[in-house]
Amino acid sequence: MAKQLSREQGITLRGSAEIVAEFFSYGINSILYQRGIYPSETFTRVQKYGLTLLVTTDPELKNYLNNVVEQLKDWLYKCLVQRLVVVISSIESSEVLERWQFDIECDRSAKDDGAPRERSQKAIQDEIRSVIRQITASVTFLPLLETTCAFDLLIYTDKDLAVPEKWEESGPQFIANSEEVRLRSFTTTIHKVSSMVAYRIPFLD
């Protein structure tokens, strides 16, 4: 019985991919809510990581994010994804105003039939909670978005990976004249996610 319990507490490659993909689902929703990209009334409260989080109820956005997360889960499992970026830009000028960057390191020696890694779910959730809290607190230091904005998701993968249908290749969409704030990281021991946000420095009149 003790052996079975130990296995349940360990982290497998597939389990790690699911944890990280789920983090991105909640993380992206949090960014879209906190930065006002979609109306606040199109979000609903859920409990996750010991926090009250907001997730979209917009059917189109929900479907889009679900598809992204499912694809991401597969790429994480195969250690093919290196970075995810949420780009926020002005609809009027197309200027990039914010760039939320999540760098992903994967231990390629991890195999699904290998022994689970020694890492408790609680320790991982504690680290993820810290990252989500920083996203939530970002409104205290990020400039107000004074124009209607849209978002893009960029996913950096291995170069030889075929681009799935409905996806397209994109440039990095950097910000001119920007500041960067590094956020916390978390690790499952198989995947490590480091995060930062870059934002355009407002011009002074």
Question: Where would I find each of the regions flagged by the language model?
Answer:
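Long protein-protein interaction modules used by eukaryotic assembly/scaffold proteins
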Residues: 1-63, 71-205
